[in-house]
Design a protein with these regions (language model features):
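Propeptide-to-catalytic entry region of secreted or membrane-anchored zinc metalloproteases
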Residues: 1-133, 140
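Active-site-proximal segment of zinc-dependent metalloprotease catalytic domains
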Residues: 112-183
Length: 183
């Protein structure tokens, strides 16, 4: 980057690769109907993915310019809802899973910081598509007992590269999957 600062200027012709990442959103609901607090609608999920794409492209109208100079740039990464399941069936990329049978899930969600709840891997093992082919996003009802509607809470998390594939992906509170939010 230091050798070619001109690459960071908007409108600069540069050699780039553009990446499209197939995404599957696993909605780990507790039996509630689509559109309830822990089971967002398809439109809500698609709106949040569209927002994510706008942020990565540098086109989201709500973005503030960099404080210390520079410019907002297109990261050349796009997230696209998966169109095929691992078995090659058609999909919209949204996988709704009733997770209410998981131990402690309905009352406390997933356990991240040694709180009461379902172990993270137990939840992920219920709904994980091959991490070599898809980016998995799990929408959960609660993390460490908090659902994101009041008080302090963990909105979501992911692991750094190098973590085992069993952990790969993003876990996010269903209440925080909202277009325009900075989660």
């Amino acid at each position: 980057i230091q050798a070619h600062p001109e690459w960071l200027r908007p409108g600069t012709n540069r050699l780039t690769a553009s990446y499209t990442i197939p995404v599957v959103v696993h909605v780990m609901h507790t039996g509630g109907a689509v559109g309830t607090i822990y089971n967002p609608t398809d439109a809500q999920i698609l709106g949040a993915i569209n927002y994510l794409n706008q942020v990565f492209a540098g086109t989201y109208a709500g973005m503030t310019p960099p404080v210390e100079g520079g410019a907002v740039v297109n990261m050349e990464v796009q997230f696209a809802m998966a169109q095929r399941t691992p078995a090659c069936g058609a999909t919209n990329g949204i996988d709704r899973v009733d997770a209410s049978a998981l131990p402690n899930y309905t009352a406390n969600g997933i356990n991240v910081n040694n709180a009461t709840g379902c172990p993270e891997l137990t939840m992920k093992n219920l709904a994980r598509w091959n991490t070599s082919n898809y980016y998995n996003i799990w929408l959960v009802n609660k993390i460490d007992g908090a659902d994101g509607t009041s008080g302090q809470f963990i909105a979501g998390f992911a692991y750094f590269p190098g973590a085992p594939s069993t952990l790969d992906g993003t876990v996010m509170l269903a209440t925080q999957m909202v277009a325009g939010e900075k989660t």
